[in-house]
Amino acid sequence: MFGMLRALKTHVEVPIVVATRAASTNAEKLEEIRERLAKGPNFQDFVQNPDNSRSEWENYEGKLRREKGEEQRLRLPPWLKTTIPVGKNYAKIKAQMRELKLSTVCEEARCPNIGECWGGGEHGTQTATIMLMGDTCTRGCRFCSVKTARKPPPLDVNEPVNTATAIASWGLDYIVLTSVDRDDLPDGGSKHIAETVREIKARNSNIFVECLVPDFRGNLECVETIANSGLDVYAHNIETVEKLTPYVRDRRAHYRQTLQVLTEAKRFNPNLITKSSIMLGLGETDEEIESTLKDLRTAGVDCVTLGQYMQPTNKHLKVIEYVTPEKFKHWEERGNELGFLYTASGPLVRSSYKAGEFFITSILENRKKRQNATELSKE
């Protein structure tokens, strides 16, 4: 996993004025969201390392791309070097994870942003990404460092309650629930994930919940279970361009299947924000990235993140290219032009990166205020 717009069925007797009014309302919402985001901090405030000025990476003379057949690994450029995570909140969350036997993708996937996310960072939005259903995946994607097995241990029936209890005590603003793939289970673990969402919301309805979920092998009943669980953001990563998908992802993961999952999630629950992520540096071309972004927009995806692929161990795919911050900025601008609610694009950006969660929180809070105002006007 880590990392198709079907038309809604309508009846001909529905008056055109209803559709027109709905379209107008959606346009107003979109404009208001854009305005709100414009007033907030720029995305570069989150991803730019203050110790690395523009001139430093512009003048970098190291090699950024491996040639075909070349075996030697590329040297890590300066803009990808991060500090060791520290801080009270970081230590608190890590300790409680151990106590409750919970896994986080932040640790399992060796995310470079763990200290900033768990600690709250400059903008104070504390986030964490919990990995449900254990630390062992039934798939073997060539970019991912999570353990794999054909038949992982059984699910922990106490995990939904333990997870919700921990999250409620942390005082987080935004939580991301992700999971390993569990192809060994009839429902892929979808009911387990949905139960966890409901437990979290029962304890604190103000926490925004994002679920970064598997494709469930295209099983739409599983997609519907998650979409209607009470979550706020439905995320499923396309990971790479179509041409590289068979080479990068597990053979059971398919590019078009991912697009269908994202499309159907929105159909099952039109109020959801949908989100996906693309890794760069695996040998893709600009034309292929452009095509992937357009496919995601056609699938109705609201938010997209683009980040640098980093080889987790010597056993995984080597980095073909280190993409410059300037190029990531280009894709951020291109994503905005294509109509995504936000495009998070930077070398250290990951699908669960806290800056993206800050922006999505703004969107969700805005929606909640509009909904409350509408309810008050009816009274």
Curated annotation (Swiss-Prot):
Record SUPFAM superfamilies: Radical SAM enzymes (SSF102114)
Cofactor binding: number and manner: Binds 2 [4Fe-4S] clusters per subunit. One cluster is coordinated with 3 cysteines and an exchangeable S-adenosyl-L-methionine.
Principal location listed in the UniProt entry: mitochondrion
UniProtKB keywords: 4Fe-4S, Iron, Iron-sulfur, Metal-binding, Mitochondrion, S-adenosyl-L-methionine, Transferase
Pathway the protein takes part in: Protein modification; protein lipoylation via endogenous pathway; protein N(6)-(lipoyl)lysine from octanoyl-[acyl-carrier-protein]: step 2/2
InterPro entries xrefs: Aldolase_TIM, Elp3/MiaA/NifB-like_rSAM, LIAS_N, Lipoyl_synth, rSAM
Residues annotated for [4Fe-4S] cluster 1 binding in this entry: C106, C111, C117, S352
Alphabetized Gene3D superfamilies for the sequence: Aldolase class I (3.20.20.70)
Coiled coil: none
Catalytic activity: [[Fe-S] cluster scaffold protein carrying a second [4Fe-4S](2+) cluster] + N(6)-octanoyl-L-lysyl-[protein] + 2 oxidized [2Fe-2S]-[ferredoxin] + 2 S-adenosyl-L-methionine + 4 H(+) = [[Fe-S] cluster scaffold protein] + N(6)-[(R)-dihydrolipoyl]-L-lysyl-[protein] + 4 Fe(3+) + 2 hydrogen sulfide + 2 5'-deoxyadenosine + 2 L-methionine + 2 reduced [2Fe-2S]-[ferredoxin]
Binding site residues for [4Fe-4S] cluster 2: C137, C141, C144
Pfam family name, one: Radical_SAM
Residue intervals of the Radical SAM core domain: 122-341
An annotated GO cellular component: mitochondrion
Enzyme nomenclature, EC number: 2.8.1.8
SS bond list: none
Gene Ontology MF annotations: 4 iron, 4 sulfur cluster binding; lipoate synthase activity; metal ion binding
Keyword set includes Repeat: no
Protein's cellular compartments: Mitochondrion
Cofactor(s) of this protein: [4Fe-4S] cluster
NCBIfam families linked to this entry: lipA, PRK05481.1, PRK12928.1
HAMAP family: Lipoyl_synth (MF_00206)
Additional note from the record: This protein may be expected to contain an N-terminal transit peptide but none has been predicted.
Protein name, as recorded: Lipoyl synthase 2, mitochondrial
